[in-house]
């Protein structure tokens, strides 16, 4: 465990390898992940075909899907055709029931609650009908209930594409096979690869700079960082865990050396 005192003594202002809770702290030099954002933004502002209001983005485990989903949902997307599109992020591992899905949308929009799913849907549709804003649903994982999402996207087709959905999935063979009727709305399918070894190494270095260290390579061994990036096998999650363990080891070794010198 690295204490705040340890970090300050090592010339950091914060832990460089903890997960960012704010999606604005996004490393922009991961080519595939940057492309995901560009493609998704294009989908969000495209109102040409009202039938196509569902996008699927598929990537390998640990490739940054959650951060990308949160970043897209956190953004406010001005649209010349329909005002502003606001995003709602949902992790479908925690949204376990259909009513939780609808309740999440109602709560995020600040609408009155209801005990009926039908009333919840009607409340959402009435709000969007009377509002200049659009709604972007960003699902981190497969949809919990396809029926309600299908109903929302069907309504959107007849109402100037006011509801759009982006779904982030693990990149598997025939990812959308189980989407059933939702495939009729599919207007975007974009698979992306994991970051390269060099990209991960650059990310780890940049995180140290963002955490306040004036010269990360004076503390971290460059080859060790490249080895961590290589052993992560494309997983950003694994790379951050291993880098954190490496930093803790370095700090402990430095503390022991200082203790011996002070005797």
Question: Model-derived features: where do they sit?
Answer:
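Walker A/P-loop nucleotide-binding motif
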Residues: 49-70
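Conserved small helical "lid"/interfacial subdomain of P-loop NTPases
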Residues: 192-222
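Conserved P-loop NTPase "ATPase switch" module shared by AAA+ and STAND
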Residues: 124-149
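Sensor-1/coupling segment of RecA-like P-loop NTPase cores
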Residues: 59, 143-145, 156-180, 190
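Conserved NTP-binding/hydrolysis module of P-loop NTPases
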Residues: 17, 96-115
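A short, basic N-terminal segment
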Residues: 1-53, 259-261
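The conserved phosphate-sensing helix
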Residues: 230-244
